[in-house]
Design a protein with these regions (language model features):
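A short, small-residue-rich loop immediately preceding and capping a beta-strand
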Residues: 24-29, 56-59, 74-92, 106-111, ...
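Anionic-ligand anchoring segments at beta-strand to alpha-helix junctions in alpha/beta enzyme folds, i.e.
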Residues: 24-60, 253, 267-268, 272-303, ...
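Thiamine diphosphate
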Residues: 244-391, 462-464, 479-481, 501-554, ...
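Conserved thiamine diphosphate
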Residues: 123-173, 197, 352-363, 530-535, ...
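Conformationally flexible catalytic loops at phosphate/diphosphate-handling active centers
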Residues: 52-56, 167-262
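Structural signature of the thiamine diphosphate
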Residues: 140-202, 366-403, 595-618
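Ferredoxin-type iron-sulfur electron-transfer modules and their immediate structural context
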Residues: 573-574, 586-745, 752-862
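Active-site cofactor/cluster-binding pocket
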Residues: 4-10, 307-312, 321-333, 411-421, ...
């Protein structure tokens, strides 16, 4: 049966299937599951019908616990009900999950599996949350890819209806939930054909109804509780066969080969991995690579994790297996991990009892697992407990890995884009991969990697496309095309080093071709020359400003990418990009749509090729790190040993011993002051002649990057040459300066907007960062000056002006440019900071306030 192909992410695939079978959905958003609920809400609002002929009834509750309670109640009333969640949200649902399972209600929870907060919060993927649900009585079905989410999502719903066991259908958070792939979609008519409608009628007939009243949820005593609990055994014993039957029905319809445990690899494999989740895709790809070299390797993919059917696992493993390595994406401190223990127990007393069975941990908190890690696993014989992708030099559990080979098929083209959070790079690449997927016969994949800055942080978009299916569920480190959308990144990150020989590098910058070489670090020039890289530049910022888009340069650079890649004929690419821009921005008005259309036209024409001189090959390497110095040794050590590496996107190189001082998750205060990201395009420039010294600008600044300074005559005379001052109002003998740390500013313009100025002329205007770099020295000088007690006495802390002469103990956070939350938090620290305890619930403020490696909270000289 041929199915329609469409480009979508895992969350959309899960929502598409669940919507078909769902009559009611109770939700509460949590990353990375929120898009599933959002899609369901959107479709219901649009009147989209499920297989029963009506839209889904959706309700958002006050928490995940409330959502689970609503699911339970809705099921009790006879409605097929679902929810979407992850991580701590899933944990809040566990009490109701016991009830739903115990009362044998048909239900599916779609879970984008995510790490649980332990020593630190982590919003990324692993299996900690779903493992915590093993005892609830929910069946657990795992999908390894976006396509499997679509296919096995149907199996989950069909099986729970017939088998009366609720199903937790899970897939890896971010790696699968947010990965975009070109996949085959279910048609709702085909899903409806497989539904057991008699089972639905039976479920509804047994639900709470005044026509046939019954009591559920009684309290049982020791005399009967145990027996009643054991009475469920037959239901669970029968359920795997029901799942298997629906897998077979799906296989017959769409030509797949889904089983409870699927084997892939050599028929005579001697080294076998057992795993579940997205890592199975990487294992498949690595197996293809190794088998070409004659290696006898294979993988058993766990589909139905609960109930765990031991005999089916035994059937899946090749008889020739000698070494079995089991991979768990979780850590169980003080014990071995769940899947490993399940496998050891299942193989006891079987023909595989004499095999070496090792267990390893991988991928915690979305740690990237590469083909090199898989090769190391296949080669592992004697390390019974091990870890992947890290260097554990403390307990020595890690497997050593070599260089990652190119294991993807030759047809696959890999592209990597470095963007600035909120510049539109991610959105543009989502459109690009959908254009490639939906308008060519090529396979397509996109994945997006972020830091934890709310906006203004670094984003990395990983795009792959080609003639073969794409199973590369790991980050690109061998690229055919790399684009840098933010020129300052060149002095912060190693990016051109990801290019293959003969690859293409596109740089968005304001430099003329003849002056580019003056700005490139030595290692960049050397790599371009030594590896025959084709080098292009484009001034996207200039084009964006001329058109009226400001810093939103996404469509400009998207157009440049299609021009250089040649994946689609230029005229077709421009048409598809304009269609996508119209769909994305039509609600914002025709003017915005036209601006984006103009940007697309301009981007394709504005690319300039830069010749790479041969002498660049001899350029000297320059350090990307600025060594911290100071008297605060714990802070300085942290900056030099941890923060610099993480901020340089080199955190994966840190060893376990490097993190030992911070094993409890604490961070030293004041670390954000060392970041000096310098990512703003424009920063405020102060004109003292127009200033009334109200300090409104400092008051509203979200990042504490503009601050008033009172100087004595002597201090002013000794100030850097670029210092601008005015006589201080109400304080004879003092000079006033409004200083800006331009390397910490995000360029939001809040200070300019609030500035009253004089006679219609503002004291602050926005100017290019490069023109204001000398103001950093002025700011640094001002911060070293002692506080002026006379000024603090004159201007009280309970006034706007007076408060801003007090040191903020919240500075340079990862909040969005123009954030409306941080100015209040900053002000509180200025008023009460010396005696504050801060308890922060999860949300925006926990990310801008406590996201590794830097915290914006700081201390004063005391």
């Amino acid at each position: 049966m041929a199915r329609k192909m469409k480009t979508m992410d895992g969350n959309t695939a899960a929502a598409h299937v669940s919507y078909a079978f769902t009559e009611a959905a109770a939700i509460y958003p949590i990353t990375p599951s929120s898009p599933m609920a959002e899609s369901t809400d959107q479709w219901a609002t649009q009147g989209k019908k499920n297989i029963f002929g009506h839209p889904v009834k959706l309700v958002e509750m006050q928490s995940e616990g409330g959502a689970a309670g609503t699911v339970h109640g809705s099921l009790a009333a006879g409605a097929l009900t679902t929810t979407y969640t992850a991580s701590q949200g899933l944990l809040l649902m566990i009490p109701n999950m016991y009830k739903i399972a115990g009362e044998q209600m048909p239900c599916v929870f779609d879970v984008s599996a995510r790490a649980l907060a332990s020593h630190a919060l982590n919003i990324f993927g692993d299996h900690s949350d779903v493992y915590a649900c093993r005892q609830t009585g929910f069946a657990m079905l795992c999908s390894s890819s976006v396509q499997e989410v679509m296919d096995l999502g149907a199996v989950a719903h069909l099986a729970t209806i017939k088998g009366r066991v609720p199903v937790l259908h899970f897939f890896d958070g971010f790696r699968t939930s947010h990965e975009i792939q070109k996949i085959e979609m279910w048609d709702y008519d085909d899903l409806a054909d497989m539904v057991d409608y008699e089972a639905i009628d039976k479920f509804r007939a047994e639900c709470l109804n005044p026509e046939h009243p019954v009591l559920r949820g009684s309290a049982q005593n020791p005399d009967i509780f145990f027996q009643a609990r054991e009475a469920a055994n037959s239901t669970y014993n029968a359920f795997p066969a029901i799942v298997e039957d629906y897998m077979n029905q799906v296989n017959a319809k769409i030509g797949t080969d889904y089983k409870l445990f699927n084997y892939y690899g050599a028929e005579d494999a001697e080294s076998v991995i057992i795993a579940m989740g997205s890592v199975c895709e990487t294992i498949d790809e690595t197996i293809d690579y190794l088998m070409k070299q004659g290696k006898k390797v294979g993988v058993v993919k766990v589909r139905l994790y609960r109930p765990f059917v031991a005999e089916k696992l035994v059937e899946a493993i090749p008889d020739t297996a000698k070494v079995i390595n089991v991979l768990d994406r979780s850590k169980e401190p003080g014990a071995r991990e769940p899947l490993y223990l399940d496998v050891v127990n299942a193989l006891r007393g079987t023909k595989f009892e004499s095999c070496t069975i090792n267990g390893g941990r991988y991928g915690l908190g979305s740690k990237d697992t590469t083909p090199a890690d898989i090769i190391a696993t296949f080669e592992n014989v004697d390390k019974n407990e091990f870890t992947l992708s890290i260097v554990d030099d403390v307990t020595n559990l890690s497997l050593e890995r070599g260089e990652t080979p190119v294991t993807a098929p030759d047809s696959i083209v890999a592209c990597k884009f470095w963007g600035l959070g909120a510049d539109g790079t991610v959105g543009a690449n989502k459109n690009s991969i959908k254009i490639i997927g939906d308008h060519t016969d090529k396979y397509a994949q996109a994945y997006f990697d972020y830091d934890s800055k709310k906006s203004g942080g670094v984003t990395m978009s990983h795009l792959r496309f080609g003639d073969d299916p794409i199973k590369s569920t790991y980050l690109i480190n061998k690229a055919d095309f790399v684009a840098c959308h933010c020129a300052p990144y060149l002095t912060k990150y190693n990016m051109v080093q990801d290019l293959k020989d003969g690859g293409t590098f596109l740089l968005n910058c304001s430099w003329a071709p003849e002056e580019v070489g003056e700005h490139l670090p030595g290692q960049v020039k050397a790599y371009l020359a030594k590896h025959n890289i084709k080098f292009y530049i484009i001034d996207g910022i200039k084009i964006g400003k001329e058109i009226g888009l400001g810093g939103r340069i996404n469509t400009v650079l998207q157009s440049a990418f299609f021009k250089l890649s040649g994946i689609i004929p230029e005229e077709d690419a421009i048409k598809y990009m304009k269609d996508a821009a119209t769909a994305s921005y039509s609600k914002k008005g025709e003017a915005i749509v036209k601006m984006n259309h103009d940007a697309i036209d301009a981007g394709a024409k504005a690319i300039v090729e830069v010749p790479v001189p041969a002498e660049w090959a001899d350029a000297e390497t320059e350090s990307l790190f600025v060594e911290a110095k100071g008297d605060n040794k714990p802070l300085v050590d942290y900056i030099n040993n941890v923060q610099n590496y993480v901020n340089g996107q080199e955190g994966n190189a840190l060893k376990v011993s490097d993190l030992m001082p911070y094993v409890d998750g604490h961070m030293p205060l004041g670390a954000s002051a060392f970041e000096k990201r310098g990512v703003a395009v424009d920063v405020p420039s102060w004109n003292p002649d127009n200033c009334i010294q109200c300090n409104f600008c400092a008051y509203v600044c979200p990042h504490a990057t503009i601050r008033p300074v009172a100087m004595t005559e002597e201090e002013a005379a000794a100030a850097p040459a670029a210092t601008k001052t005015a006589d201080m109002t109400g304080m004879p003998g003092y000079k006033f300066a409004m200083t800006v740390t331009v390397l910490d500013c995000l360029g939001c313009g809040s200070c300019v907007n609030i500035c009253p100025g004089k006679k219609g002329e503002k004291a602050l205007t926005m100017a290019g960062l490069d023109s204001q770099r000398d103001q950093q020295e002025v700011y640094d000088y001002g911060q070293k000056l002692p506080a002026k007690e006379e000024v603090l006495a004159k201007f009280k802390a309970d006034s706007v002006k007076g408060s801003q002469f007090r040191q903020p103990l919240l500075e340079f956070s990862g909040a969005c440019a123009g954030c409306g939350e941080t100015p209040y938090a900053k002000l509180i620290t200025q008023l009460f900071g010396e005696r504050m305890y801060i308890a922060n619930a999860t949300g925006c403020s926990s990310i801008w306030g406590g996201s590794a490696p830097a915290t914006p909270y700081t201390t004063n000289a005391k």
